[in-house]
Amino acid sequence: MSYKVNSSYPDSIPPTEQPYMASQYKQDLQSNIAMATNSEQQRQQQQQQQQQQQQWINQPTAENSDLKEKMNCKNTLNEYIFDFLTKSSLKNTAAAFAQDAHLDRDKGQNPIDGPKSKENNGNQNTFSKVVDTPQGFLYEWWQIFWDIFNTSSSRGGSEFAQQYYQLVLQEQRQEQIYRSLAVHAARLQHDAERRGEYSNEDIDPMHLAAMMLGNPMAPAVQMRNVNMNPIPIPMVGNPIVNNFSIPPYNNANPTTGATAVAPTAPPSGDFTNVGPTQNRSQNVTGWPVYNYPMQPTTENPVGNPCNNNTTNNTTNNKSPVNQPKSLKTMHSTDKPNNVPTSKSTRSRSATSKAKGKVKAGLVAKRRRKNNTATVSAGSTNAGSPNITTPGSATSEPAMVGSRVNKTPRSDIATNFRNQAIIFGEEDIYSNSKSSPSLDGASPSALASKQPTKVRKNTKKASTSAFPVESTNKLGGNSVVTGKKRSPPNTRMSRRKSTPSVILNADATKDENNMLRTFSNTIAPNIHSAPPTKTANSLPFPGINLGSFNKPAVSSPLSSVTESCFDPESGKIAGKNGPKRAVNSKVSASSPLSIATPRSGDAQKQRSSKVPGNVVIKPPHGFSTTNLNITLKNSKIITSQNNTVSQELPNGGNILEAQVGNDSRSSKGNRNTLSTPEEKKPSSNNQGYDFDALKNSSSLLFPNQAYASNNRTPNENSNVADETSASTNSGDNDNTLIQPSSNVGTTLGPQQTSTNENQNVHSQNLKFGNIGMVEDQGPDYDLNLLDTNENDFNFINWEG
């Protein structure tokens, strides 16, 4: 921009008197410079845009023959149709089709003749890309397409097409499974990255999925195939992702469905989520093999006795409890249907029952069953007898009481307490008198004068005694039960859940051949203590033929059942129920049977009966057994080589049990059943003679023997000859006493006490610690003169 100079101002400098004009000129100059600069920038930008547009317009596009061919699919199809018509010798049809389809051909040639490659190579650009086949490519393609289409649409097809189609389907399934597992692996990898546990491992998704499923698989290797891309495949645009059934990849419970995959070897050591939880908290699908049908465990809340020999020690397996309704009685056929059973809680006494059963006659005898149960000793526990049922090859351990299983208000405590009352203290809680045959010499008659201490002993004894189930004369089963205040009469219960020794007799035998027995069924305590040593008060040293040094099992109480034994049939029949007990604070008792004459007037029987034998047989399976027997009104025959009789004084009065001090107690104030002191052998070489021995393996004492013979009131000494139970007849009484083990017997001190009444002279014998040969236990025969149940103050087996 040019400015004109004023003629009046040659230097083009305005005068001073016009200051405003100078500043305005300066501003106009700056604005003009700025406008000129902006206009040039805009002009340059416009030129650049024009150049870019020109370059975009003038930019040549790359020609691609394949792209053109794909874009012109219809033209390609027309060319293949023309090729098919030409090779099918349809020249006129091909020329007409080429003319109508506007195909590029040599116009100088006749369309009927078709294109000629030799003359028109330069002009046939369109047909240069057609695949040359003998019959035309379109025909061959159509054959393959139609065959596969029929196969896929279940319309048939050739065999090769079907095989090809199956291969294609299998490949598609594998690819689909692989894609699904890859997606799952990507998800796991993403979760691991979020937790900070991923360190850029390159793992095959198939191996990872198999490892997560718990299936064994070869170690993962580096993937080398391009198609096996470890990168998660995006599922967008793939419509057939979820169209195939895929096996589950994380199924913790294999029992939920049929398609569940059971884990075989989880990669980690934790089987809590993948393995079945069958034995995690209980004995689950079956009863333990340790339990027997009639033997509840110590967890039994009903109060039934438990078997302490069959304790289940499994860590995670608790033994189930057999409810009373599921318990099956040992002999369900012993109870006849036509014999009524008394439902009264008070039953008759033993003597009244005996009289009533005698009146029943032979008709009641024919109704008896011949089922018996044998009591043998357990091999593992010396105090646990086994019960063997006839016809069975196996034996079950008998019920063993435990002090741990104390349930004062349960049925077992009631039964124990009732046993103590009936067996030992039958006159304490009763307002009625005992039978006349038992009043004369019953130890409990005098013991009832001290009800306080006896009751204390009874409570301690009540937790380990068991009811005895015996078959009466009519063949019915009866279980001893009772309350705390029950009379001396026994209670007859129909409960069959408690296994016990069942005794019966042959109904065809005469009553005169039936022998009275006392069957002792005991329940030793687990908490056993070694046997205490007692001083030998006899004039000769105690005989010890071998001690196995096993602890004795102590039991406070043993229940006695009066029974009948038939010597010809060898069977035992329970009679009159349980009788009475002796001292309740004694060592462990074992099953014992002592043959005595029939009940009744004891003094009358002594004058009319001939001597009988008491056969003490050692039980099977015990290693040591101590037998304590207190006899009354007997004589001791001492000798070195010959048996010399030495009579004890006999007052001739009725036998009376007297309360004295127990020599086994350190206090000396406990009441115990004992008898006055008797005479002892006068020589150190003198001993007690076992007069009759059953077999060759019996105990033989050289120069020492014991024979206990009673005197009749007319001072006639009758010594019983050696007889057996099977050959006894008439009024001779012979029975077997079957304790429970391999017995060893040592003559021990006499436990006697003196009192102001010297009418009864008793002797306390203790046989203990005699070594026996296995399975050959001896039989100990004590010749007793007319011995009945009143002649035994104390019968006890320790072992």
From Swiss-Prot:
Q: Where is the composition biased (Basic residues)?
A: 354-370, 482-497
According to the UniProt record, where is the region Disordered?
Answer: 37-68, 101-127, 255-406, 431-501, 568-622, 644-691, 705-758
Annotated Polar residues bias: 270-285, 318-340, 371-395, 460-480, 584-593, 660-675
For whether the record's keyword set contains Glycosyltransferase, the answer is no
**What subcellular compartments does it reside in?**
Nucleus
One GO BP annotation here?
regulation of biosynthetic process
In this chain the LisH domain maps to 73-105
* UniProt xrefs under InterPro entries: LisH
Residue spans with biased composition (Low complexity)?
41-55, 307-317, 341-353
**Keywords of this protein's UniProt record, alphabetized?**
Activator, Nucleus, Transcription, Transcription regulation
Output the superkingdom of the source species: Eukaryota
Which Gene Ontology cellular component annotation is one that this UniProt entry carries?
nucleus
The record's listing under PROSITE patterns reads: LISH
Similarity section:
Belongs to the FLO8 family.
Which purpose does this protein serve, as stated in its record?
Required for diploid filamentous growth, haploid invasive growth and flocculation. Putative transcriptional activator of FLO1.
Q: What is this protein called?
A: Transcriptional activator FLO8
Name the lineage.
Eukaryota, Fungi, Dikarya, Ascomycota, Saccharomycotina
Gene that this polypeptide is encoded by: FLO8
